[in-house]
Every structure is written in C-alpha cells, then in structure tokens.
Amino acid sequence: VVVAGAGNAAMSAAVSAAEAGAKVIVLEKAPEHLRGGNTYFTGDFRFPWASVEDLAPLVPDFSDAEAKGIRETCTPYSQTDFYDDVMRVTEGRSDPELLELLVSQAFPAMQWMAAMGHTWVPSYANPTASMPLALNGGGATLSDHWFDVAARKGVEILYDHQAIELLPDSAGEISGIRVQTPAGYTTFHTK
C-alpha cells in the first residue's frame, strides 16, 4: 500500500493497512523535521457522542469533576446533528452517501485512535456540543504519536517524496504512482 501524505488521515490509513497485514510505504513531500502537514496545528475533533460515558474511554484518568464539567457545558451531539452541520456548512454539496459513512464511523474511529494510544482532554476553552474534547498535547503530539505507531507497525516513511501522478493500467486500474524525490522522478508500482 502506498499512502500519499503524512497527516492525520494518511497516517491513520497507513497504520490501519499495516494492522491488516499490508506492506506500507508513506510518501511525505516534506523533510522529516516538517512532517505531518497541517495535522501539527489541529486540536479538536468533531464526532457524534450520546453521553459523557461515551467520552470516558478517550480521556485517561477521566475524573468525576471532568465528567461534571462536560455535563454542565455540553450537550450530546447526535449523528443527525453531525450530518446536518456538515450539510449546512457545505451548503448541501456533501455527497450524502460518503457523509453518512463519515458520520457513522467517526466515533468508532475515535475509539480505534484511543486503542492506538491517542488521548484527549476535556475542552473547556471551546465547550461546544460537537467538540467536548481536545487532543492531549494538540496536533504536534497527534502527529508525533502517529509516526511512533507507524514505526512500530513496520510502516516505511520516505521523506522529500512527493506523489505527482497516479498511473492507471490499460483497464483503468491504478498500477503505480509517479513520485518526485531529491534524486529525480521514480515510479512505485502497486499490486
């Protein structure tokens, strides 16, 4: 599996593929010290949740005081709320089928990320129903942790490697990817 990019979505895909037994290469166009793109600057995640008890497994040592704080400042955020918010901010341009997939899998994705060792803290600075938690350590920690997990799972990361073009075979299936490297252009072939 070849993954283009090394932000949160890309690293999630890379780790998931490695967990499924695939050999994974991540192509990161940035040098190592700038890796991860905009993930470095993120802090919050929007996901549906039904109760404070849903949030507890995402927060290490979740205290009664933290639970009380969320109960007092936030209301549950349903899948319908999430769906409607995305449709509202996109002015109805989101693909309904893909959006339904996002909405239905957002909380399971959070649980999976927690199983990978990511953690959150209550977000009292921005206590909205849709984002009651913030990343523990922010985006920099999220990014660094993904790279640690990927290394443990055997994911190969190639820095200064920019994906340029997907290469289809005669049947239209993607059979490779053209990549710009410090040494010039190369092609990675897929199976």
Give short role names for the model-derived ranges.
Residues 183-191:
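Core beta-strand elements of the Rossmann-like FAD/NAD(P) dinucleotide-binding domain
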Residues 30, 182-183:
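Glycine-/small-residue-rich beta->alpha transition segments that form the dinucleotide
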Residues 176-181:
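Short beta-strand segments that buttress and anchor functional surface loops
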Residues 1-9, 25:
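Beta1/beta-strand and adjacent pyrophosphate-binding region of the FAD-binding site
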Residues 17:
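Aromatic pocket-lining residues of Rossmann-like dinucleotide-binding sites
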